[in-house]
C-alpha cells in the first residue's frame, strides 16, 4: 500500500490542506485534486474512484472532501482503514469543518497526518496516541513558563507597591496645599509614569513653599489641568531632567539576565551572520548515516543501573534514478545486539546476507533532502567495563567549606568530542572557587550548575580531574551528574562496505558517516 497524498479539498476541488508522502510537484498534485470533483458522480454510494494512474479514496465531511490519493496496486481495505483514522483525527484538530476552520488548523492537521502515515504506509496508532505525540509536552518548558510567570507577578507587585506610595504622597501634598504651604494656586493633576521594571520620574519642583519642607518630589511631575504649561514645567532641568529612551536601563537589564545565566541573543551585523560557517548539504548522490544513542545510568558508588544502546541506519538519496540500489553492510559480533528492519525492507535478504534492499526491486528508495531510516538495532546487557566515559565525584566537608574532587577516565576504544560534565551545586551567591582543572569551566548561576568542558579526549588525555570549593553542602547535592559527548565510531561498528545497483550501470558514488551520541548519560 502506498498513499501518495492525503488532502482536504472543497466541493469545487480547491486544495485546503494536502500532505504528499512521495516526491510530487505542486502542479501535479493540484491537477489531481482539481480533477477529482468531476469524477465523483451524484447519488453514488462508492467511496473510491479510479483513473488510469491513481485511485481516489474519499469521504465527504460536511461541505468538504477528505481524500486519499493512492496507486492502483494498493490494498483498498487498508486504504479505507487509513481514511477512517484520518476522518476521526480531522474533527479533533479542526472543530469547525469549513474552509476557514481547516485553513486555520492546517499545520496541526499536517502534523497529525504525518503521525498516522509514514512513507505512504499507515502507522499502527490510535487517535489518542496521535494526539499525545503531537502535544509534545515538555517538563522543562512548563518549569520555565512557571518561573517567568512568577517573575511577572513579582514585578507587578512591585509596581503596585510603588503606585501606592505615589498615591500616599499625592494625598499628603494635597493636605499641605490646603494648609497654605504652597505658593502655587489652583488644582493639580499628578501624572505617574511607569517603566516596565521600575517607577521613574523627573525632578520638577512643585513650588517655593514646599522647598523648605525637605520633601523628595522627584518621583512625580505636576502639570496644570487647563491652559498652557508653565515655563517651570516645560524647561529641562540641569542634571535632573527626564531622560527619554531606555538604552541605559535596557543594557542594565540584559546584563543582569546574563549574570543569572540567561542566553541573550544580541543584534549582529549582516556581514557577521553571513560569515558563520553553515553545514554544507550532501554532495554525493547517496549518503548513509549511522548513529547510536546512549542511555546510561551509573551508580555513584559503582555499578550500572541502565546501559542501553539504540542505533539507526538512515539513507538519503538525492535523485530518483539512484534509488534502485542495495546496501551491503557488516558489523562486529557484539553480545546482546538485535536488529529490526523497516517493513518495506527484505528481511530474509538482510538476515541471510546482511544486504539492505527493498522488498520490491522495482520500487526505489525515497529521494529528496530527508533521511529515511531503514535499519534499527539495540544493544543491551553490557557492563561497567564497556562505558566510554567514567566519572567519579568525591565531595568532603572541612570546616566552613566543601572540597569537591571530580575525575574522569575514558575508554581506549573511543575518541570523545565536545565533552561536557554538568555538576549541580547548592544555591550560591557567587561562582565556586575552581582550584585545579583539566579543561575549561563555566558556572550557570541561574540553574546553579558547574559545567566542565573538554574539547577532545584522545590518547593524550584519557584521564583528568577538577577540584573546586563551595560552602558546606550535603554530598548528595552534587548528584545527578549529567554528561554529554559525541564520537565518530560506534559500539556495533556497523558500516556499509558496498552498493549494488539493481539496474544496468555503475553503482552511484556514496559517502557514510558514523556517530555515537550520549542522549541521556548520568551518574546518580
Swiss-Prot record:
Q: Which GO terms describe its cellular component?
A: COPI vesicle coat; Golgi membrane
Give a GO biological-process term. protein transport
Q: Where in the cell is it found?
A: Cytoplasm; Golgi apparatus membrane; Cytoplasmic vesicle, COPI-coated vesicle membrane
Q: Boundaries of each MHD domain copy?
A: 283-524
- Superkingdom field: Eukaryota
Keyword Protein transport annotated:
yes
Please give the function described in this protein's UniProt entry: The coatomer is a cytosolic protein complex that binds to dilysine motifs and reversibly associates with Golgi non-clathrin-coated vesicles, which further mediate biosynthetic protein transport from the ER, via the Golgi up to the trans Golgi network. Coatomer complex is required for budding from Golgi membranes, and is essential for the retrograde Golgi-to-ER transport of dilysine-tagged proteins.
Tell me what this protein is called.
Coatomer subunit delta-1
Taxonomic placement: Eukaryota, Viridiplantae, Streptophyta, Embryophyta, Tracheophyta
Amino acid at each position: 500500500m502506498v498513499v501518495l497524498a492525503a488532502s482536504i479539498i472543497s466541493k469545487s476541488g480547491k486544495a485546503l490542506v494536502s500532505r504528499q508522502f512521495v516526491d510530487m510537484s505542486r502542479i501535479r498534485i493540484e491537477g489531481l485534486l482539481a480533477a477529482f470533483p468531476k469524477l465523483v458522480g451524484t447519488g453514488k454510494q462508492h467511496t473510491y474512484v479510479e483513473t488510469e494512474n491513481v485511485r481516489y479514496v474519499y469521504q465527504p465531511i460536511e461541505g468538504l472532501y477528505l481524500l486519499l490519493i493512492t496507486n492502483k496496486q494498493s490494498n483498498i481495505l487498508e486504504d479505507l482503514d487509513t481514511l477512517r483514522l484520518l476522518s476521526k483525527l480531522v474533527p479533533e484538530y479542526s472543530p469547525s469543518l469549513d474552509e476557514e476552520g481547516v485553513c486555520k488548523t492546517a499545520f496541526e492537521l499536517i502534523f497529525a497526518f504525518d503521525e498516522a502515515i509514514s512513507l505512504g504506509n499507515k502507522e499502527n496508532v490510535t487517535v489518542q496516541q496521535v494526539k499525545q505525540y503531537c502535544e509534545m509536552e515538555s517538563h522543562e518548558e512548563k518549569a520555565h513558563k512557571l518561573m517567568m510567570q512568577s517573575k511577572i507577578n513579582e514585578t507587578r507587585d512591585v509596581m503596585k507597591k510603588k503606585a501606592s506610595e505615589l498615591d500616599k504622597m499625592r494625598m499628603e501634598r494635597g493636605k499641605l496645599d490646603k494648609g497654605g504651604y504652597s505658593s502655587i494656586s489652583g488644582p493639580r493633576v499628578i501624572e505617574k509614569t511607569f517603566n516596565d521594571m521600575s517607577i521613574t520620574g523627573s525632578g520638577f519642583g512643585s513650588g517655593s513653599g514646599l522647598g523648605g519642607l525637605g520633601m523628595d518630589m522627584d518621583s512625580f511631575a505636576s502639570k496644570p489641568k487647563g491652559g498652557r504649561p508653565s515655563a517651570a514645567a516645560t524647561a529641562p532641568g540641569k542634571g535632573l531632567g527626564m531622560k527619554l529612551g531606555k538604552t541605559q536601563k535596557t543594557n542594565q537589564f540584559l546584563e543582569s539576565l546574563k549574570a543569572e545565566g540567561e542566553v541573550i541573543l544580541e543584534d549582529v551585523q549582516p556581514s557577521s551572520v553571513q560569515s558563520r560557517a553553515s553545514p554544507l548539504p550532501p554532495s554525493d548522490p547517496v549518503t548513509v548515516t549511522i548513529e547510536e544513542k546512549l542511555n546510561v545510568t551509573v551508580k555513584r558508588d559503582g555499578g550500572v543501573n541502565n546501559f542501553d544502546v539504540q542505533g539507526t541506519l538512515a539513507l538519503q538519496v538525492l535523485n530518483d534514478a539512484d534509488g534502485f540500489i542495495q546496501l551491503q553492510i557488516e558489523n562486529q559480533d557484539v553480545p546482546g545486539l538485535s536488529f529490526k528492519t523497516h517493513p518495506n525492507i527484505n528481511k530474509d535478504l538482510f538476515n541471510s546476507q546482511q544486504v539492505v534492499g527493498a522488498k520490491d526491486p522495482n520500487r526505489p528508495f525515497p529521494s529528496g533532502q530527508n533521511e529515511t531510516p531503514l535499519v534499527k538495532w539495540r544493544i543491551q546487557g553490557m557492563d561497567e567495563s564497556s562505558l566510554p566515559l567514567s566519572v567519579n565525584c568525591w565531595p568532603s566537608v572541612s570546616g566552613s567549606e566543601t572540597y569537591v574532587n571530580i575525575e574522569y577516565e575514558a575508554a581506549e576504544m573511543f575518541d570523545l568530542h565536545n565533552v561536557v560534565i554538568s555538576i549541580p551545586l547548592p544555591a550560591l551567591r557567587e561562582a565556586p572557587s575552581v582550584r585545579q582543572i583539566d579543561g575549561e569551566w563555566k558556572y550557570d548561576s541561574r540553574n546553579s550548575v558547574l559545567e566542565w568542558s573538554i574539547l577532545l579526549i584522545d590518547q593524550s588525555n584519557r584521564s583528568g580531574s577538577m577540584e573546586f570549593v563551595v560552602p558546606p553542602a550535603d554530598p548528595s547535592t552534587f548528584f545527578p551528574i549529567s554528561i554529554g559527548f559525541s564520537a565518530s565510531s560506534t559500539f556495533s561498528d556497523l558500516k556499509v562496505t558496498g552498493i549494488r545497483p539493481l539496474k544496468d550501470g555503475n553503482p552511484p558514488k556514496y559517502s557514510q558517516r558514523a556517530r555515537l551520541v550520549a542522549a541521556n548519560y548520568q551518574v546518580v
